[in-house]
Design a protein with these regions (language model features):
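Short, polar N-cap/turn motifs at the start of nucleic acid-interacting alpha helices
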Residues: 165-172, 238, 257-276, 301
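Short, aromatic/basic-rich helix-turn unit that serves as a nucleic-acid recognition element
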Residues: 18-48
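N-terminal DNA-binding recognition helix of tyrosine site-specific recombinases/integrases
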Residues: 50, 58-73, 77-112, 154-156, ...
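Catalytic-site neighborhood detector that most strongly recognizes the C-terminal catalytic loop/helix
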Residues: 124, 175-183, 195, 259, ...
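C-terminal catalytic core of tyrosine-transesterase DNA break-rejoin enzymes
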Residues: 84, 143-146, 150-157, 226-229, ...
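Basic, Lys/Arg- and aromatic-enriched nucleic-acid-binding interface segment
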Residues: 85-88, 101, 105-155, 159-161, ...
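C-terminal secondary-structure termini that scaffold catalytic or DNA-interacting sites
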Residues: 14, 170, 181, 200-207, ...
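Active-site/catalytic core of tyrosine-dependent DNA strand-transfer enzymes
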Residues: 170, 179, 191-237
């Protein structure tokens, strides 16, 4: 499938006895990133570039806690969110840790306290909102939205899905571990709505491309713009594609699916998502309320 690709990483050998600078720390970090096959390399490189604007060319041992605090203040003034700044300084800390393990440094700065982050987003799609928004999306985007809404999968897991992963006869979609953010494969039963999506995609399948979701053979991109415009046209508050993931987890619980099974379907490794977004089975709350009223009534009689 065509689309933007990351330029290849080029790792220059480090001369023996060369001074350890921020730039060498960054190179070692990216080498480790590639070796570990971590996801979101583009994001990691972008964060490093923010760090490079402040620390580029500096000797590693001259970077101290005050410098890191100044960086936090600088990024705040630029309008960066606390969560973004924390991710960037975590990368810087990781750079030093790698250098320590390699014997390139014998110490690292004591990093300042992480910034207090805003509570996580709690956006959800109500079903009528979902229908209105998808009606204002081009078909390729609507199909991805459908799959996200009924699966709870992550965006990249959906966009990188291939027909090798789809078993329409067996009625399952299999996500291979190397394409999962958590590196754990999983199986998704093909429900009626998902089958309709996959049938549509099958009719649009390109012989030269094995990806399920594309737009005339090109990667489906610019999601934020597409959803923003569709939400505006539908008179629905702005939503993100990731809101489908939260919505799917909530809908599974509301449907009476045990949390353990819901986690297997969506790929959540811990139940923290249910606490974070206050996802509860409302029927259980209603039942608990009735039991409380019944108990009080009996205790007074």
């Amino acid at each position: 499938m065509t689309g933007r690709k990351n330029p290849p990483l080029e790792f220059a050998p480090v001369p023996e006895g060369a001074p350890i600078t921020f730039d060498l720390l960054a190179q070692a970090y990216l080498e480790d990133y590639v070796l570990q096959r971590y996801k979101a390399l583009t994001t990691a490189r972008a964060r490093i570039e923010h760090l490079r604007q402040t620390f580029g060319g500096r000797l590693a041992l001259t970077i101290n806690a005050n410098d890191v605090r100044s960086y936090q203040l600088h990024r705040r003034k630029e309008g960066a969110e606390a969560a973004t700044i924390n991710r960037e300084t975590s990368i810087l800390s990781r750079m030093f840790q790698i250098a320590l393990r390699r014997g390139q440094l014998d110490r690292m700065p004591l990093f300042p306290t992480r910034l207090q982050e805003n509570p996580p987003r709690q956006g959800f799609f109500e079903h009528d909102e979902f229908l209105k928004v998808r009606a204002n999306l081009p078909q390729a985007y609507a199909d991805v939205l459908d799959f996200a809404y009924y699966s709870g999968w992550r965006r990249n897991e959906i966009l990188h899905l291939t027909w090798d992963d789809v078993d329409l006869i067996g009625g399952v979609v299999r996500l291979s571990p190397h394409r999962s953010k958590t590196r754990a494969g999983r199986v998704l039963p093909i429900s009626t709505p998902l089958r309709a999506v996959l049938k549509r995609r099958q009719r649009l399948r390109k012989r030269t491309d094995n990806h399920v979701f594309h737009r005339d053979g090109v990667t489906v991109r610019k999601w934020r713009n597409a959803l923003r415009d569709a939400c505006q046209a539908a008179d629905v508050p702005h939503r993100l594609l990731h809101d489908c993931r939260r919505t799917a987890a909530r809908n599974l619980v509301r449907a009476g699916v045990p949390e353990r099974v819901a986690m297997l379907l969506t790929g959540h490794k811990t139940r923290a998502v249910f606490d974070r977004y206050n996802i509860v089975n409302e029927q259980e709350l209603l039942t608990a309320g009735e039991r409380l009223a019944d108990y009080v009534s009996k205790s007074r009689s």
